[in-house]
Amino acid sequence: MEHQGWSFEENYSLSTNRRSIRPQDELVELLWRDGQVVLQSQTHREQTQTQKQDHHEEALRSSTFLEDQETVSWIQYPPDEDPFEPDDFSSHFFSTMDPLQRPTSETVKPKSSPEPPQVMVKPKACPDPPPQVMPPPKFRLTNSSSGIRETEMEQYSVTTVGPSHCGSNPSQNDLDVSMSHDRSKNIEEKLNPNASSSSGGSSGCSFGKDIKEMASGRCITTDRKRKRINHTDESVSLSDAIGNKSNQRSGSNRRSRAAEVHNLSERRRRDRINERMKALQELIPHCSKTDKASILDEAIDYLKSLQLQLQVMWMGSGMAAAAASAPMMFPGVQPQQFIRQIQSPVQLPRFPVMDQSAIQNNPGLVCQNPVQNQIISDRFARYIGGFPHMQAATQMQPMEMLRFSSPAGQQSQQPSSVPTKTTDGSRLDH
């Protein structure tokens, strides 16, 4: 069936192609432009407005930006249905258009894959997001590549824009794509200064220098902390050493003082001992010894000889009278002092008086043996050399000593006749 250049088959194929591009339940506006009828979709504008609102909300939610955008793009375009749907009757009213001379706005893309076509959202048409949406870039060396990836993901998250059905839209879409591309370049340059042109090379170098300076500053601070710790440790050790030295010095000073005091006391004691030994040496007659041990031996022998002489002198009865008649003079004793001591009977030393019966029973005590007397005289002659009276007393005969022994002996030697007086004064002899 042909009517004024109508081709049902061509119009049918054109309508099917249009219907394959247009989604179901799409509102179409008929416009007359340059002598041709142009289709303008009304639902596409509504969809773009909804997409703008979705894009604004997705900019606020940066964490779920990709997932929400992909879900919106899939929901807006359901899969194509059967091309032979009987409800589509619009193909009978657009047969005047020549299929060979189609406008550029109605070029149909061949369906290469079952995937639905992607529609580019105009980022420029939406209002600019607030400055709080995108945080300022953090200049870190390790995150430079991640920043580039984020910009690439942001660039590729916006789906590509194909030519719409309206003839006035392609120029706007191209402008929007170019503007979005420029914007992504600016963001990429801000995030990655090293990837800029030769004029931006100095900024990259300064960025690297800043990082090196920061690292060197950290190293310097750590070194300073270590030096401070070491300095404090050294000061503490020095103070401890000084304290130990002071304690040692005080202890050594105390020890030295104690040693000096001990030495002084020892010297004084030795001087006193030497003085006493000299005095003892002067008291012992005929003592020519110099050492202390020999001087002490001489003093002991001298005291023994004196004790023996005293015993011999007081064992005889006549020794006391002889001593009274001719007192024995010791060195250093004045005669007047000795006589004064004899006259006072209280100050006389008292010796034990030997019993006469004991003397008669033991004649050896009276030294009646001349040989024994000779031994005694020879033994202590050197000590009695300075005392002539004592030497003469020791050389007396035993009979002479017995003569002065006791008054009982003398009474026995007297005559038995003793004159007596009577009452009338006459004298009687018995």
UniProtKB/Swiss-Prot annotation:
The residue ranges flagged as biased composition, category Low complexity, are 244-253, 405-419
What turns on this gene? By UV treatment. Down-regulated by ethylene (ACC) and auxin (IAA), but up-regulated by salt (NaCl), cold and heat. Follows a free-running robust circadian rhythm, with higher levels during the light phase. Rapidly induced by light in etiolated plants. Sixfold induction by both red and far-red light. Accumulates in response to warm temperatures (e.g. 27 degrees Celsius) via PTAC12/HMR/PAP5-mediated stabilization in the light.
What is the deletion mutant like? Reduced responses to warm temperature (e.g. 27 degrees Celsius), including thermoresponsive growth-relevant genes expression and hypocotyl growth; this phenotype is stronger in the doule mutant lacking both PIF4 and PTAC12/HMR/PAP5.
Where in the sequence does UniProt note compositional bias of the Polar residues kind?
A: 61-71, 160-175
Transcription regulation in keyword set: yes
The record's subcellular location field reads: Nucleus
What is known to happen upon mutating H231D? Answer: In strain: cv. Bla-6, cv. Et-0, cv. Li-5:3, cv. Mt-0, cv. Pa-2 and cv. Tsu-1
Q: What PANTHER family does the annotation carry?
A: BHLH DOMAIN-CONTAINING PROTEIN, TRANSCRIPTION FACTOR PIF3
Q: What is this protein called?
A: Transcription factor PIF4
